[in-house]
Regions:
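A conserved ligand/cofactor-binding region detector
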Residues: 1-801
Length: 801
């Protein structure tokens, strides 16, 4: 397609939608028109793709996740459709900058952190590799929240993303699914058949809206189906009798389910709402999957041959008993046959090594909210206990630990582990840890079910669409094969000693840093020096991710520079970006500490030219697309054995940042791929952490003999300008659950090594090159094909050339 032809399509859309000419259209009108053009093209491509899949009997993959962190869609849709250059030219001919149009789109408010971003990357990977994939989630009206930092404190504001994001969604009210909550269950037997009657229930309708993800330069398209909660009908009788509040409350209560991602569950009402959300997602999705399958095959007997359902974390666990409910109550299968089908179609990805993070629901809340599902889980638990008793005779403690219900709680992870045909971790280390600790007993019970698929990222978004300068260098050195196959990046290794290439790499990074500094100044007013080291830690704010370890070192560096103003110190800009869960008080204290430390340092003329701290408010996908190409140091500093994998670390690596991190999660594989000498590794190893926990960890043992640690803690404890951070420091001095103080000294050593290495620009560029060259293994394409081969047993749709 030529730019002229594209310009005509755009003008036709502007005329039909808004009745305006391109030269007078607003940026918002142009954005919406471009989105509609892309949506229509992707919808047509998806119909062809699905038709081919059904016609050839290709296995369908369904990916259930509570969140999909999609970011913006316009830029990547144009890019993957191969229309980015013609769109840019068509708009330039009308004196319009395409980048300014991209800024009109809000980030889709459907996710929070790595879990949701991984799900979004895998939709991209499925589309690109021609795996017939559908994602399922909830159409959150307000998403997670918009973060506002006021006087150092995080404030949560409604993220009203739908007015700008709705254009990507196509609603299908005719495909709504009824979801039933509460009520009573009545069981009857008639001529050997078991009948279930559910009475006095509350209905909620799940209305689907679809958005599409186009595969890169191909014919594959993935669909993301999002469910919106609506009351089944308006209570006109109550309204007519003057009971306005009753009539309206039914609507409001139903629609609460799809208002906000992860409502605060520090109270009973929040817990019930979360449970209702999870069942709503699970039941709507399973109902849709069953209906789709029946429309193609008219039987569920062959469901395992034609369908694979991936549960991404424990949030969609209730899909398992819901599938059982449909097979038993609506389709007349006996228990053994129904459970056999479930065992074959469901697989589960675990995302945490911390047992306390595995979801459990109070039995009374569960039974009241989901009475029929509770009955099914009780029967699953009874049968599981019988089976486990045969596997582990006499070991009642093990059976109780592995049971689906115990200690008055319904255990989501155990439902998954008992039922799923595959249980996978998301990095090699994580997959070993879950076999050794969290799911050790289940590993003994069904060892062949445990697998590993290391996380992958949609690398084209983070490289091809975000870092054109680096792509130009890659095209000139290794050709453009890497755009289709990320493993081609390894060809860059042969340039590791090419001084010209290394010099160009440094120049590209400096240009990207200048671009980011300019973007930051324009969007926030914050001024940073592009010639300083850009040291970045952007991820959820959480104690286990140890942003307070980073902050403690910044405090120590500040004190050092105050005492040694003429010290040889390469200027450094520390960049943070993170949201804290609304009910997570300590994480909010950590944000306040970092922000206040930044205010102090950035306003101190004695140090601000050598040290700066930037907190990126409302960190999101589109902001990260600006940051990743500019980053030089990737802080991945979780306590060894606590991070499952990570995805930010992979994006940083792809763009040439050096990992400053522990050997945790995917950092282990990053160091293996690029060479440990090309990262800055510090801290205890997982066995050392476990041993220290076993003998008893006392943070003061590490603080007492360390003057730097003592000074930094005292400084933060005393505070300044009437502010102090004793709650954070007291936590570090007393319990320190993530062993910040045990790793602090070695972390400082790694930071000192960083300064020395960075001073040798050629050495630093070589380290950067080795990271770029060996990052291809972490592509979502590779990860999806691993899942397809080892877990889903799914083949690509044979689309032909």
């Amino acid at each position: 397609m030529t730019s002229k032809e594209f310009g005509k399509i755009l003008q036709d859309k502007l005329t039909s939608e808004y009745g305006v000419e391109l030269n007078v259209a607003s940026n918002q009108q142009i954005y919406r028109s471009l989105a509609l053009i892309c949506r229509q093209m992707m919808s047509e491509n998806h119909k062809k793709f699905q038709s081919k899949a059904i016609g050839t009997g290709t296995k369908q993959v369904y990916y259930l996740c509570m969140e999909f962190l999609m970011g913006r869609s316009l830029k990547m849709s144009l890019f993957n459709l191969g229309l980015d250059e013609v769109a840019k030219k068509a708009l330039a001919d009308a004196d319009i900058n395409l980048d300014s149009i991209f800024e009109e789109e809000p980030d889709a408010g459907l996710g929070n952190g790595g879990l949701g971003r991984l799900a979004a990357c895998y939709l991209d990977g499925m589309a690109t590799t021609d795996i017939c994939g559908t994602g399922y989630s909830i159409l959150y009206e307000y998403g997670i929240f918009k973060q506002k930092i006021v006087d150092g404190w995080q404030q949560e504001r409604a993220d009203n993303w739908l007015p700008g994001g709705q254009v990507w969604l196509k609603s299908h009210p005719d495909q709504a699914v009824e979801i039933r909550f509460d009520g009573e269950i009545h069981e009857n037997w008639d001529n050997g058949f078991h009948y279930i009657q559910h009475t006095n229930y509350n209905s909620v309708m799940a209305i689907p809206s679809d958005m599409y993800v186009q595969g890169y330069d191909g014919k594959g398209v993935a669909k993301l189906r999002l469910w919106q909660a609506k009351a089944p009908d308006f209570d006109m009788s109550s309204f007519s009798l003057g009971n306005y509040n009753t009539a309206m409350s039914k609507n409001a209560n139903a629609e609460l389910i799809s208002k906000v991602l992860y409502p605060n569950d520090n109270h009973v009402e929040g817990k019930i709402l979360r449970l209702r959300q999870q069942y709503f997602l699970s039941a709507a999705s399973i109902g849709d999957i069953v209906q789709n399958h029946l429309s193609s095959y008219a039987t569920l007997e062959n469901l395992p041959d034609k369908v694979a359902i991936q549960l991404n974390d424990t949030h969609p666990t209730l899909a398992i008993p819901e599938m059982m409910r449909i097979l038993l109550d609506e389709c007349g299968f006996d228990w053994d046959k129904a459970f056999s089908i479930c065992q074959k179609v469901f697989s589960y990805t675990n995302h945490t090594v911390m047992a306390e993070a595995l979801e459990k629901w109070n039995v009374d809340i569960f039974k009241m909210t989901l009475p029929r599902i509770y009955q099914i889980v009780v029967e699953m638990d009874r049968r599981a206990r019988e089976e486990l008793a045969k596997a582990f005779p006499g070991d009642q403690g093990k059976i109780d630990y592995m049971a689906l219900i115990g200690d008055n709680q319904v255990r989501m992870a155990n439902i998954c582990a008992y039922t799923a045909n595959s249980i996978n971790g998301v990095s090699k280390l994580h997959s070993e840890i879950i076999k050794e600790s969290v799911f050790h007993d289940y590993y003994l019970f069904k060892p062949n079910a445990f697998k590993n698929v290391t996380n992958g990222i949609a690398y084209r978004r983070w490289l091809l669409a975000s870092n054109p300068g680096l792509c130009k260098l890659l095209d000139e050195t290794i050709g453009d094969g890497y755009k289709h196959d990320a493993s081609d990046l390894t060809k860059l290794n042969k340039y590791a000693d090419d001084k010209t290439v290394l010099k160009k790499l440094n120049e590209i990074k400096l240009t990207n840093k200048k671009d980011f500094a300019s973007y930051l100044a324009k969007s926030t007013g914050q001024v940073i020096d592009p010639n300083s080291i850009f040291d970045c830690q952007v991820k959820r704010m959480h104690e286990y991710k140890r942003q307070h370890l980073n902050a403690l070192n910044i405090a120590a560096q500040y004190l050092y520079l105050k005492e040694n103003p003429n010290a040889d110190f390469i200027p450094k800009t520390y960049i943070f970006g993170a949201k804290a869960a609304p009910g997570y008080y300590m994480a909010k204290q950590m944000i306040r500490m970092i922000c206040k430390l930044g205010d102090l340092i950035n306003n101190d003329p004695a140090v601000r030219d050598k040290l700066r701290v930037v907190y990126l408010e409302e960190y999101c996908v589109s902001l990260s697309e600006h940051l990743m190409p500019a980053a030089e140091v990737s802080e991945q500093i979780s306590l060894a054995g606590t991070e499952a994998s990570g995805t930010g670390n992979l994006k940083f690596m792809l763009n040439g940042a050096i990992t400053l991190g522990t050997l945790d999660g995917a950092n282990v594989e990053i160091a293996d791929a690029a060479g440990k000498e090309n990262e800055l590794i510090f801290g205890m190893l997982t066995p050392e952490v476990n041993n220290l926990k076993r003998v008893g960890y006392h943070p003061n043992a590490f603080i007492m003999g360390d003057d730097v640690a003592n000074s930094a803690l005292n400084f933060l404890e005393r505070g300044w300008n009437g502010e102090n951070f004793h709650e954070v420091t007291e936590n570090l001095r007393s319990s320190d659950p993530y062993m910040v103080m045990a790793d602090f000294k070695d972390y400082r050593r790694a930071q000192a090594d960083l300064q020395k290495l960075y001073a040798d620009r050629e050495t630093w560029a070589r380290m950067s090159l080795k990271n770029i060259a060996n990052s291809g293994i972490f592509s979502a394409d590779r990860a999806v094909l691993d899942y397809a081969r080892d877990i889903w047993y799914a083949s690509p749709v044979p689309m032909g050339k």
